[in-house]
């Protein structure tokens, strides 16, 4: 769905029309039970661009253990999970080592849905690109979806930023 906005003064458009492509899924606009101010970006329906500075990316560094929970506000049948991630090799932005998804009916007892693990070669691939990492949820029913990820670690000696801690950027959670 496309949303268009413009600023007008005295009936005359000032500047260009802003166009935002919104995506809607079961996670969109749902509450996040996490501890970061910008986690709301993960469910706002807007995808990040190839510029990790476009204010649509939620980021972590210092090898953080990343964890957030989406409250779907009721039990839903869940078929697919995806999360957007950016790589910007020159800036030390890389996918995490691991992404795990778990579900719960009560936000206390969680059951595993799936886990993605990435090799060092995959993590430190050169270039600037965006990927969606997805997993089949098998039609499980649940109210809460917990996402846990582990940071990529320290950039290797062969990296343009050797010894620097890699950063992880996610833009949108998509649940179908």
Question: Language-model segments: which ranges?
Answer:
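Aromatic, loop-rich ligand-recognition surfaces of beta-strand-rich domains
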Residues: 50-114, 129-176
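Short intrinsically disordered coil segments
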Residues: 35-39, 115-117, 162-164
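Short glycine-/Asp-/Thr-/Trp-enriched loop segments that recur within the blades
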Residues: 124-128
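Solvent-exposed serine/threonine-rich low-complexity stretches and specific carbohydrate-binding patches
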Residues: 112-123
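Short, compositionally stereotyped local motifs that mark structural "simplifiers"
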Residues: 1-67, 86
């Amino acid at each position: 769905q496309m949303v268009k906005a413009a600023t007008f003064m005295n009936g005359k458009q000032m500047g260009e029309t802003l166009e935002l492509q919104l995506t809607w899924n079961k996670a969109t606009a749902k509450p996040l039970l996490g501890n970061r101010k910008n986690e709301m970006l993960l469910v706002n329906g807007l995808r990040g661009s190839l510029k990790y500075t476009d204010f649509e990316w939620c980021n972590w560094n210092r090898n953080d253990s990343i964890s957030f929970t989406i409250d779907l506000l009721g039990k839903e049948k869940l078929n697919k999970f995806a999360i957007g991630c950016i790589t910007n090799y020159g800036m030390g932005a890389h996918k995490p080592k691991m992404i795990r998804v778990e579900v719960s009916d009560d936000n206390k007892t969680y059951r595993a849905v799936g886990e993605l693990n990435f090799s060092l070669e995959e993590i430190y691939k050169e270039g600037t690109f965006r990927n969606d990492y997805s997993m089949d949820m098998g039609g499980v029913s649940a109210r809460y979806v917990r996402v846990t990820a582990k940071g990529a670690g320290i950039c290797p000696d062969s990296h343009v930023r050797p010894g620097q801690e890699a950063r992880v950027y996610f833009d949108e959670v998509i649940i179908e």
